[in-house]
């Protein structure tokens, strides 16, 4: 009897169980599947002042700017801060969405900061797995970077 009890005790001790623990962090965002969602992501990163998100939404046909080694991390952050200043906005409205050379899209966007509205073009390109904002006209939105918008 004693051997049976020890055998059952050993068997119970060797039993394994699996417990599924849900992850507590956010699930990764899905990459934008088109030019407009990529523009929305870029402008949301600008508005949120999110350097990491901006580096993922800004790129070219080879991929995100943050993932290539053409510029240093320090230079990337300086450029992102400039973009955040120039394209600072409270709201935006997308006008034209036109196919241009090289498979790119040109979107005309009106950015509003306070009572000031400026319109510029954003150029978007399809990368290996998603779309990116490649460049945008900064001259037209220069005054959005001012400390205060005019009343």
Predicted regions: what they are:
Residues 2-7:
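Sec-dependent signal peptide recognition
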């Amino acid at each position: 009897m004693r051997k049976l009890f020890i055998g059952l005790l050993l068997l119970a001790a060797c039993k394994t169980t699996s417990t599924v623990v849900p992850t507590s962090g956010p699930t990764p965002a899905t990459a934008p599947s088109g030019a407009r969602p990529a523009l929305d992501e870029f402008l949301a990163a600008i508005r949120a002042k999110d350097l990491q998100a901006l580096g993922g939404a800004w790129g070219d046909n080879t991929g995100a700017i943050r993932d290539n080694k053409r510029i240093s991390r320090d230079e990337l952050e300086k450029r992102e801060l400039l973009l955040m200043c120039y394209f600072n906005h409270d709201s935006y409205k997308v006008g034209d969405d036109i196919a241009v050379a090289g498979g790119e899209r040109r979107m005309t966007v009106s950015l509003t900061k306070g009572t000031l509205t400026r319109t510029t073009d954003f150029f978007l390109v399809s990368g290996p797995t998603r779309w990116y904002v490649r460049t945008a006209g900064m001259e037209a939105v220069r005054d959005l970077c001012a400390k205060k918008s005019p009343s």
